[in-house]
Amino acid sequence: MRVVIQRVTEASVSIRGALHSRIGQGVLILVGIEDRDGESDIELLTSKISNLRIFDDSEGVMNLSVKDINGEALVVSQFTLMGSTRKGNRPSYIKASRPEIAIPLYESFCNSLSAKLGKAVRQGVFGADMQVALVNDGPVTILIDTHNKE
């Protein structure tokens, strides 16, 4: 499972020109799922995301988590995160899970993160053509791949 975490002052998802979800200060999380992902990946990521210290404290040091600041989360599924550019110029998405595998994992991810944050998590719509708008604060952008731990 791969996630891109972006610290934002605001973010939103629109579908066919209509606003679907919006958050204020918090994190926008793009999620890519592959067949070998499971509940252990979800637990690792949602624990890490909810406690990741990427928000400034009163001294201007990144020492606070989204939970500490009572921030919001917007989660968007993005199969293109699983793209491979190893061969040729067109990305291959063969590693991305099919919807019947990915949707339950995506929903579990959102539920787990919501429980850890103690509040509802806003979401995109799985498989929809979405327009994602954000104001990246910093910018701060973190990539985590559960199968390539660093």
Swiss-Prot record:
Annotated Gene Ontology cellular component terms: cytoplasm
Record's subcellular location: Cytoplasm
**Record bears the keyword Protein biosynthesis:** no
State the signal peptide span: none
Record-linked InterPro entries: Daa-tRNA_deacyls_DTD, DTD-like_sf
Which superkingdom?
Bacteria
**Molecular functions (GO terms):** D-tyrosyl-tRNA(Tyr) deacylase activity; Gly-tRNA(Ala) deacylase activity; Ser(Gly)-tRNA(Ala) hydrolase activity; tRNA binding
Per the record, the major location class is cytoplasm
BP-aspect Gene Ontology terms: D-amino acid catabolic process
Q: Which UniProt keywords apply?
A: Cytoplasm, Hydrolase, RNA-binding, tRNA-binding
Q: Which reaction does it catalyse?
A: glycyl-tRNA(Ala) + H2O = tRNA(Ala) + glycine + H(+); a D-aminoacyl-tRNA + H2O = a tRNA + a D-alpha-amino acid + H(+)
Member of which family?
Belongs to the DTD family.
The UniProt entry, under PANTHER family, shows: D-AMINOACYL-TRNA DEACYLASE 1 (PTHR10472:SF5), D-TYROSYL-TRNA TYR DEACYLASE (PTHR10472)
Q: What does the record say about domains?
A: A Gly-cisPro motif from one monomer fits into the active site of the other monomer to allow specific chiral rejection of L-amino acids.
What name does the UniProt record give this protein? D-aminoacyl-tRNA deacylase
Question: To which species is this protein native?
Answer: Porphyromonas gingivalis (strain ATCC BAA-308 / W83)
Which gene specifies this protein's sequence?
dtd
